[in-house]
């Protein structure tokens, strides 16, 4: 019986080739679009390293200042200063961990070699490593003591370490950024650019 169905289907395809091609292409395109939408939803909602605890995250993206006067409509929105983060968020007791960060692009160089390629830099604190579970391939993150002391330490992704030193083994080596010499303390696996909160190529203390 199934062979008969297959023969009939093949015969119909041969009789109406153009219509069959359009129908099959349309069905395949619709299925592909559904799969893409499901994939995008999973990427944005499912937790995986370095955002394994994504379902427990709470984000505060900026601040808003508005007038207290009755009927006042004056408002000002923007990012947060480090003082706001320290006074309003570091003092919280309920969260297991709190972290502040900002991102920028900047070129990196070696002490004896000027380079011009720019990388995505994440200026953050020691709390970042408690929230995001980056898989380290060498070394480890900068500590709270390093952050408080303003010691110029740096964590690189594998790709950046390879670009700069030709190998992923970079702990203890020095990198120059904006005329400041940083010491590499750790190397992590590359972070997919689809992870908006944890994506970066270089991590340094914003202190």
Segments (PLM) and residue ranges:
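A short amphipathic helical element positioned immediately N-terminal to and/or at the very start
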Residues: 2-14, 84-89
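Generic structural signal for small/hydrophobic residues in well-ordered secondary structure
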Residues: 13-16, 23, 44, 60, ...
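Short, strongly hydrophobic transmembrane alpha-helices
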Residues: 16-45
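Membrane-proximal extracellular/periplasmic loop immediately following the first transmembrane helix
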Residues: 37-107
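Solvent-exposed, non-transmembrane alpha-helical starts
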Residues: 71-82, 115-120, 148-152, 191-203
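Short, solvent-exposed loop/turn elements at beta->coil junctions and helix N-caps
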Residues: 104-110, 141-144
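Short strand-coil-strand connectors
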Residues: 109-113, 178-180
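Mid-to-C-terminal secondary-structure elements
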Residues: 122, 127-141, 152-207
């Amino acid at each position: 019986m199934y062979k008969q169905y297959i023969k009939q289907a093949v015969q119909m395809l041969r009789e109406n080739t153009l219509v069959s091609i359009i129908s099959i292409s349309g069905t395949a395109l619709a299925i592909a679009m559904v799969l893409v939408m499901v994939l995008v939803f999973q990427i944005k909602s499912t937790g995986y390293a370095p955002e394994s605890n994504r379902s427990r995250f709470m984000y505060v993206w900026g601040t808003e200042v508005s007038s207290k006067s009755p009927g006042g409509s004056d408002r000002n929105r923007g990012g947060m200063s480090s003082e706001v983060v320290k006074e309003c968020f570091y003092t919280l007791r309920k969260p297991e961990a709190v972290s502040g960060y900002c991102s920028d692009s900047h070129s990196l160089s070696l002490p004896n070699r000027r380079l011009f390629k720019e990388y995505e830099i994440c200026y953050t604190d020691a709390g970042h490593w408690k929230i995001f579970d980056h898989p380290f391939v060498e070394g480890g993150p900068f500590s709270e003591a390093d952050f408080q002391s303003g010691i110029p330490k740096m964590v690189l992704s594998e790709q950046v370490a390879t670009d700069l030193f030709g190998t992923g083994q970079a702990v203890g080596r020095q990198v120059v950024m904006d005329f400041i010499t940083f010491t590499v303390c750790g190397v992590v696996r590359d972070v997919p650019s689809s992870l908006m909160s944890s994506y970066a190529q270089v991590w340094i203390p914003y202190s």
